[in-house]
């Protein structure tokens, strides 16, 4: 893994996404500028934290960060653009939503969207860079809450459990009930359920 060198600048934003793999719902991104004067203990990749810990950290991040913002790309945008381009768009939206413009942006992964300030992609950034860890927590808590809300409207699909990912249960219910308007029609299993696969 390439050694990561933290940029020498004051206002660094971390950006991460949640929801590239699911068959349903938006891809959600977050951008966070942490306050060096108000450190947050225990930041880590959101997937490595318990739900209870994520929720507590989410509130602490919102309270202590210099600025934070959420971005998203809806299922119809994912279908029109493809998941990679939709994710880049959602990241741009998260950065644009910050009320303080960052001097530098660190993005989780290996690709950067076009941004009006310098940016760098950091592989495994969600466990290496506190700003990206914070962004991953905000994005995951937000998207999980959306899946729980969707589960109330469509209880037969089990969205609260699998968060829209293509589990055996989700695929079984997709075949049984068809797709909701929140499903991503460009994704193979949804296409097949709708009879659109060629």
Curated annotation (Swiss-Prot):
Principal localisation: cytoplasm
Gene Ontology MF term list: manganese ion binding; RNA binding; RNA-DNA hybrid ribonuclease activity
Cellular compartment(s): Cytoplasm
Ranges where the RNase H type-2 domain occurs: 10-198
CDD domains listed in its UniProt record: RNase_HII_bacteria_HII_like (cd07182)
Enzyme class: hydrolase
Signal peptide: none
Protein name (record): Ribonuclease HII
Species in which this protein is naturally found: Escherichia fergusonii (strain ATCC 35469 / DSM 13698 / CCUG 18766 / IAM 14443 / JCM 21226 / LMG 7866 / NBRC 102419 / NCTC 12128 / CDC 0568-73)
Gene from which the chain derives: rnhB
